[in-house]
Regions:
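Eukaryote-skewed repeat-based solenoidal scaffolds used as protein-protein interaction platforms
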Residues: 69-73, 80-81, 85, 90-234
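Non-catalytic, usually N-terminal nucleic-acid engagement modules in DNA/RNA processing proteins
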Residues: 13-104, 121, 196-199, 233-234
Length: 235
């Protein structure tokens, strides 16, 4: 389904894609984040944004998006920018989404935003961040960013909600940083990982962070959590 934009935001703009209109006239978009929903498909069940699958090349270099701001454009084409960083580094991209579009289009690959979904959050907080990640992903795809979908989850009980809207049979990215050696966190991560495999059936996984015992190495490419060049393929 297509989001009923005019029913949600019955406002007219001279140029809804104008950086000046949407990022300089307002300190943040606030309620005008509804503008991002224009032209985006949503699931019929819970109205999560629908993210299209990715089937392109596998990148060789990962770097956090906030570390790339001062890099010359000539170096951006071979880099995969990720949002596996503090939420404070992601918020500017949410608050000023149009401001960064032209720059993001110059980057070879961009992984979905990764607003945190913590186990100690209440459910609505988890779903809000899941919604934001999907909305930003669909918005980027619609505006010419070479986006790699990156599903995430916070608990097994609501895994279907976390996965709703992410593409099936796609190359995806998955993060394990922050899990560490905590047994409960590893257990939650692995349970969600197996459920994600069953629901989305990804064709390949770009894995950022440490390998977790029991995951599918045969369909994974592993990238170290150091924001430096280098990668290795799963066996």
């Amino acid at each position: 389904m297509t989001y009923p934009y005019q029913k949600i935001l019955p406002l007219e703009f001279e140029n809804p894609d104008s950086n000046q209109l949407l990022t300089e006239s307002y300190k943040t978009l606030g309620a005008l984040h509804s503008v991002l929903c224009r032209g985006i498909e949503f699931t019929s069940k819970n109205q999560f944004p629908i993210v299209e699958p990715y089937s392109g090349n596998i990148p060789e270099m990962f770097c956090s998006v906030h570390r790339l701001r001062k890099k010359p454009d000539s170096l951006l084409r071979g880099i995969c920018a990720h949002y596996y960083t503090s939420d404070s580094n992601i918020e500017p991209f949410w608050n000023y989404p149009f401001r960064y579009l032209q720059w993001l289009r110059k980057i070879g690959y961009v992984i979905s935003t990764d607003f945190s979904i913590y186990t100690n959050m209440v459910l609505i907080q988890k779903l809000w961040n899941s919604f934001r990640n999907k909305l930003m992903s669909a918005f980027y795809q619609r505006n010419g960013v070479n986006l790699i979908p990156a599903p995430s989850w916070g608990d097994l009980d609501n895994i279907e909600l976390y996965m709703e809207g992410w593409p099936k049979d796609s190359l995806i990215a998955v993060n394990s940083t922050g899990i560490g050696q905590d047994k409960q966190c590893r257990h939650i991560w692995l349970d969600g990982y197996y459920a994600m495999l069953d629901i989305l059936k990804p064709i390949h996984i770009l894995r950022y962070g440490a390998y977790m015992e029991g995951e599918r190495k045969d369909i994974s490419t592993y990238y170290p959590n150091n924001n430096k060049p280098g990668y290795r393929y799963g066996s």
